[in-house]
Regions:
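Sec-dependent N-terminal signal peptides
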Residues: 3-13
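Charge-biased low-complexity segments
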Residues: 17-159
């Protein structure tokens, strides 16, 4: 009985295995990841057909290459890499009014949480403030639509 009492008494002071919490380990290792959205405007600008005898399609002031440079520069500033990732080919359809102003746009295909990308593209287009020479049918200005395909790719980098 005395031996059991001594063993219990000394066993109370011996430490068992200690548990290490996961948070202590993960505090020392931080992961840095950079996300970049790249896009290509290599596809030619396409015009929806006007149904008239002698159509003249809408043109961006400065031409197609200046339009692509401007939209590329504006999208670089407005696409938010922290909120979403985007991959694949999208169609940006621009609706040009009779007065040569951008009336609205449409981004296809529609994807889940695509409203964030649409918001950023809208901000880029507003900031670009595009001026167009309106389309005409037999010398009369008409509404027109222009389609530009954009190929998006999201890349992640470890720093």
């Amino acid at each position: 009985m005395r031996l059991i009492f001594i063993l219990l008494f000394t066993g109370a002071f011996v430490q068992a295995q200690t548990l290490i919490e996961d948070s202590e380990i993960s505090e020392n290792s931080e992961e840095f990841v950079r996300v970049a959205i790249s896009y290509e405007l290599d596809h030619p600008t396409e015009y929806y057909r006007l149904k008239c005898g002698s159509p003249v399609y809408a043109r961006f002031t400065g031409g197609e290459s200046i339009f692509k440079q401007n939209i590329s520069r504006q999208m670089k500033g407005f696409l938010d890499t922290g909120l979403y990732t985007v991959n694949g080919t999208f169609e940006l359809i621009l609706f040009i009014g009779k007065n040569g102003s951008l009336q609205r746009f449409q981004l296809k295909p529609e994807v889940a949480n695509g409203h964030l990308l649409e918001r950023d593209v809208e901000l880029a287009l507003r900031n670009m403030n595009p001026s167009w020479t309106p389309a005409t049918c037999n010398g009369i200005p008409v509404d027109s639509r222009i389609r530009q395909k954009i190929n998006f790719r999201t890349d992640s980098f470890d720093l």
